[in-house]
Amino acid sequence: MNTLKRLIILTILLSLLAFSFPSTCLFAAPNPPQKNVIFMIMDGTNSDIVTLSRWYRGTDLQLDKILVGGTRTYSAQSAITDSAAAGSAMATGMKTKADYIGMNPDGRPVLTVLEGAKLDGYKTGIVATSPVQHATPAAFTSHVLNREEFGDIGEQQVYQGLDVILGGGAAWLKPKSKDHVKNDDGMLKTKEVSREDGENLVEIIGAEGYDLVLKRDGLLKRKGASKLWGAFAEEDIAYEMDRKTLKPDEPSLAEMTRAAIQRLSQSEKGFFLMVEGSKVDWAAHKNDPVGMISEVLSFDDAVGEALKFAREDRNTMVVAVTDHGNSGLTLGNQGTNGDYKNQPVEKFVEPLRKAELTVKGAVSQLKEDHSNLKEVLSNYGLGNLSKKEFCAMEDASKKAEDLEDEMVKLMAKRANLGFTTHGHTGEDVFLYAYGPGKPVGLIENTDIPRVISKYLGFSLSSGEFVSWYVDGAEFYRERGFDVKIEGRTSKNPVMVVKRGDEKLRFPENKDFYWENGEKVRLKSVNVYDGQTFYVHVEG
């Protein structure tokens, strides 16, 4: 009995002793878990092409497993948005005007969710199958009034300090480059694409510590945690269906997504990654159902890579959405009016499955003498043409664009598909999401970056972020400085600020200024819209 009492007393004393010490003495304080966001955008995709792609593949899509709601896509000025305004809305949490990139409706630069994540210590990256300077990736990484300003966009991206950039757009990194394209007659010609300011951004990319890769093999072989820039095409990366045979040196969207995640996930705090499947939109503008399916399925494979990581990681939010509809594609057309209730799936997908290339890929193989026209048509799945149909193709083949138009019209007819437009459409679109903090329900496109920033622990509407950029001339003049813009109409304008012996020089699109000859790095790039220099001023 005495022994039992002693054991009870000893146990109580040990318990009291343990609780008398701070827990940090007994256990190491755990590091806060990583928080990651993979924001995936399938450009220009309406609901019917998602349905058609599912039927074409014959199995459920990765996207189907994470459908949670819908998104409204209108812009500040139109019921039907363009990609610049849509991308900016999803990057900044603010509706804006057509062509504006990272700008509010008044034309002032606004911090993006990617920039906010970078400032908060997260690793950041973008992936796209378009040139990385194109509207959607640009909206997360730059600030211009016109989406066509690829030179300014590309320069800002280089100086933004992102950790991973993968896609096309090599042409806008070099002072002079040449791209081989076909003219309207289907003849090869050399088109010169170059930076108008003459700067060699490839050299800057190297100086900024990036591992630069130009081919698929280089991407797949490279591992590590260093910064990574992949420029795999002068302009856009080939459609996935074409890439496999015509451009095998270019990586798939899924491969780029996997590589980006591998690099970014080595961050202790976490990462933000934006992935765009850019070219559903391009095929939709052409009314090419084969190209549209190619890119929807390519995007879905990339979603699979993101979900695989997120399910293992358990601290990753995945959001997937399209920025707007395009083409008004429908399963069913005027030809099915009288008997729409007796249309088996095969009537829609079998004509499409005969295609081995998209219309762009097929026509790119047309010889100068057009002697292989039948082969070109067959590569697009158009065999067994009537004499009337083939004559129409021969007449159209004088211009590549006309031939493409005739080919997609015949394919749509054979596959019982309808198209209402070659432009964007204004419907609500599907919202897909997975993981902690994910958005659900029918929401505005501007809600997405707010949900993301909240999960990552910052607010895009905070006073610091809202007032991040100031009118440089106004700010410094109020403090007694003389201000002038050197080279206002040149391609390399500089804001010069002077007071006594103090002289500051702010070059456009760069993340630094010169103070009496010494370079001072900034947390963001300087933005010039042709009239006003916007800068960030510490404190």
Locations of the language-model features?
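Bacterial N-terminal signal peptides that target proteins for export
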Residues: 2-11
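Bacterial N-terminal signal peptides
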Residues: 10-22
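Sec/Tat signal peptide C-region and signal peptidase I cleavage site
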Residues: 23-27
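Cleaved targeting-peptide boundary
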Residues: 29-33
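A post-motif C-terminal structural segment
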Residues: 35-36, 45-50, 55-88, 97, ...
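Glycine-rich anion/phosphate-binding loops
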Residues: 103-111, 148
